[in-house]
Amino acid sequence: MSMQDPIADMFTRIRNAQGANKVTVKMPSSKQKVAIAQVLKEEGFITGYSAESTVKPELEVELKYFEGKPVIETIERVSRPGLRIYKKRNELPNVMGGLGIAVVSTSKGLMTDRAARQAGLGGEIIGYVA
C-alpha cells in the first residue's frame, strides 16, 4: 500500500518517538524529508540526522531533549495533499509569537518563515514546529 502523505508520516513518527522517549527514529527517506530535517537541525529542534542511500533509502533523526522533556512540543502538518496552503511573503504566519517556526517550501528550497520573510519569498506552508 502506498503512503498518501509522507511528510505527515514523518511528523507523526517524530511525535510518537518523542512520546516514547526514543533517542532516534527511522523512516523512509526522500529529498524533501532530508530538507525538513536540515531545517529542524539548523533551528535546534533535533540533534542531527543521517540519510542512508541503500536499496530502500532511510532517514534516521536524532531527537533532542532538554531536562528529560522533548524540545519539540508541537509538530503539525498544515498543507496536505488534499488542501494545499500557500501564503505570500507578507502573510507568512508567526508561530507561537516567534518561538516556533513554520517550515515553508519556496522557489529557493525549504526554509523557515523568518528566512522566507527576509528573502522576500512566499510559498507552501509545510508545517508548524514549536
From Swiss-Prot:
SUPFAM superfamilies found in the cross-reference section: Ribosomal protein S8
GO CC aspect terms: ribonucleoprotein complex; ribosome
Record's keyword annotation contains RNA-binding: yes
Source organism: Idiomarina loihiensis (strain ATCC BAA-735 / DSM 15497 / L2-TR)
Organism domain of life: Bacteria
Alphabetized Gene3D superfamilies for the sequence: 3.30.1370.30, 3.30.1490.10
GO biological process, one term: translation
Official protein name in the record: Small ribosomal subunit protein uS8
Family statement: Belongs to the universal ribosomal protein uS8 family.
Function noted in UniProt: One of the primary rRNA binding proteins, it binds directly to 16S rRNA central domain where it helps coordinate assembly of the platform of the 30S subunit.
Record's keyword annotation contains Metal-binding: no
Oligomer status and interactors: Part of the 30S ribosomal subunit. Contacts proteins S5 and S12.
Keywords: Ribonucleoprotein, Ribosomal protein, RNA-binding, rRNA-binding
A Pfam family the protein falls into: Ribosomal_S8
GO MF term set: rRNA binding; structural constituent of ribosome
